[in-house]
């Protein structure tokens, strides 16, 4: 009986000792965590303070720079210097429409039907231009004359369909249909861009000098 009581008392003392030692370890662990948290918080506060100081210095430098620009009108002076630079540079533009730049002899502009120097129409109504036109903008009707030659009774071009490819001019065996040098033929209505034979012949008579010169200069390459 005495041995049993001794064992129980020893077990109780051992358990109490373990309990006290566990509380001590737990307390030391908590103290370590608290110290780490305090050190982490202090480091974070230091970083935020340093970042705030940098932003404040940057803001002050920006304010100072803007104040100096406003005081000395640096932006205005910079803009005026650019204006003066281009003011004294040589002109690279022309005063259109009072001045017009050069056109290439191969320029493809408004269509025209040409005549021979005798006044006879060049077109022989072969309809090659009508056949080769990719936009199907040309409509031709013809009949045979008393002398056996064929001439057109109708020659229409829908300028709203034309893509100015120049195939009609290349296909013509007698240089009757050409694309002249005129590029100023804007209209207000659609009907004005539906050219008939009379309109095309009128264009040819008007631009014959320029057209003949362009064809002559390009004759070696055709």
From Swiss-Prot:
Domain 4Fe-4S ferredoxin-type: 114-143, 153-182
Keyword Metal-binding attributed: yes
Residues that coordinate or bind [4Fe-4S] cluster 2: 133, 162, 165, 168
Family: Belongs to the complex I 23 kDa subunit family.
Binding site for [4Fe-4S] cluster 1: 123, 126, 129, 172
Organism: Arabidopsis thaliana
Principal subcellular localization: mitochondrion
UniProt keywords, alphabetically: 4Fe-4S, Electron transport, Iron, Iron-sulfur, Metal-binding, Mitochondrion, NAD, Oxidoreductase, Repeat, Respiratory chain, Transit peptide, Translocase, Transport, Ubiquinone
Function (record text): Core subunit of the mitochondrial membrane respiratory chain NADH dehydrogenase (Complex I) that is believed to belong to the minimal assembly required for catalysis. Complex I functions in the transfer of electrons from NADH to the respiratory chain. The immediate electron acceptor for the enzyme is believed to be ubiquinone. May donate electrons to ubiquinone.
An example Gene Ontology CC term for this record: nucleus
Taxonomic superkingdom: Eukaryota
SUPFAM superfamilies: 4Fe-4S ferredoxins
Name by which UniProt lists this protein: NADH dehydrogenase [ubiquinone] iron-sulfur protein 8-B, mitochondrial
InterPro entries, A to Z: 4Fe4S_Fe-S-bd, 4Fe4S_Fe_S_CS, NADH_quinone_OxRdtase_chainI
Compartment(s) where it occurs, according to its Swiss-Prot or TrEMBL record: Mitochondrion
Catalysed reactions, semicolon-separated: a ubiquinone + NADH + 5 H(+)(in) = a ubiquinol + NAD(+) + 4 H(+)(out)
Enzyme nomenclature, EC number: 7.1.1.2
Cofactor(s) recorded in Swiss-Prot or TrEMBL: [4Fe-4S] cluster
Keyword GTP-binding annotated: no
GO molecular function per UniProt: 4 iron, 4 sulfur cluster binding; metal ion binding; NADH dehydrogenase (ubiquinone) activity
Subunit structure: Complex I is composed of at least 49 different subunits. This is a component of the iron-sulfur (IP) fragment of the enzyme.
Note accompanying the cofactor annotation: Binds 2 [4Fe-4S] clusters per subunit.
